[in-house]
């Protein structure tokens, strides 16, 4: 399943529409995605956060039966969230679409996948790197 059976949803909007607690002020929204097979709902929700005008923290929890699908989602979300200084909009779009819909990729895309894959392995297996990322996240959260 590559493309999904439903259009991308703004899950924060869906929560506001159907929640019985819609007038209750919450600081954190936890979203569990099971078998979504791609990150379209995550991307749409993140892209639409400005419309809601709140400072809501959104946690996404993704469960997939196949670890390959999780790795694919993480790679696609990494491309979408890559800083503009690292990857321009046109390059980001080409890379995202190439990985989203193709089996064969260009050499430049294969190099990007290899670099990011090594970074992901480092993130998971190196405790010092995890502590560094956590500290960096805390500092960035405090600055914002």
Feature-to-residue mapping (PLM):
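Class I S-adenosyl-L-methionine-dependent methyltransferase module
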Residues: 50-144
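N-terminal charged/capping segments associated with class I S-adenosyl-L-methionine
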Residues: 1-51, 64-84, 94-100
């Amino acid at each position: 399943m590559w493309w999904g059976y439903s259009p991308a949803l703004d899950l924060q909007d869906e929560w506001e529409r159907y929640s019985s607690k819609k007038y209750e002020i919450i600081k954190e929204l936890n979203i569990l995605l099971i078998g979504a097979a791609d990150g379209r709902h995550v991307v749409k929700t993140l892209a639409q956060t400005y419309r809601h005008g709140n400072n809501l923290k959104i946690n996404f929890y993704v469960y997939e039966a196949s670890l390959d699908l999780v790795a694919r989602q993480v790679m696609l979300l990494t491309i979408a969230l890559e800083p503009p200084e690292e990857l321009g909009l046109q390059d980001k779009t080409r890379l995202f679409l190439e990985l989203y819909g193709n089996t064969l990729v260009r050499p430049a895309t294969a190099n990007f996948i290899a670099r990011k894959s090594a970074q992901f392995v480092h993130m998971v297996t190196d405790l010092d790197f995890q502590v560094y990322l956590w500290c960096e996240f805390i500092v960035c959260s405090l600055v914002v």
